[in-house]
Amino acid sequence: MPSQKSFRTKQKLAKAQKQNRPLPQWIRLRSGNTIRYNAKRRHWRRTKLNI
């Protein structure tokens, strides 16, 4: 990844960074909730973004 990124590349990286977080705990407490964890978590070394 070059240090001088295009704006679109930077936007994609920023979005991926925001998505890559655990599930908030208050969501687990909602009634009738079946979501236990964020299934789309990504580790920087295991799975790459292909951008």
From Swiss-Prot:
Subunit structure as annotated in this protein's UniProt entry: Interacts with YIH1.
Pfam families per record: Ribosomal_L39
UniProt record similarity statement: Belongs to the eukaryotic ribosomal protein eL39 family.
Any one Gene Ontology BP term: translation
Segments of this protein annotated with the region Disordered: 1-22
Protein name (record): Large ribosomal subunit protein eL39
Keyword Iron-sulfur tagged: no
Chain's gene name: RPL39
Species: Debaryomyces hansenii (strain ATCC 36239 / CBS 767 / BCRC 21394 / JCM 1990 / NBRC 0083 / IGC 2968)
GO CC, alphabetical: cytosolic large ribosomal subunit; preribosome
InterPro entries in the cross-refs: Ribosomal_eL39, Ribosomal_eL39_CS, Ribosomal_eL39_dom_sf
Keyword Disulfide bond part of the UniProt annotation: no
Record keywords: Ribonucleoprotein, Ribosomal protein
Gene Ontology molecular function: structural constituent of ribosome
Highest taxon in the source lineage: Eukaryota
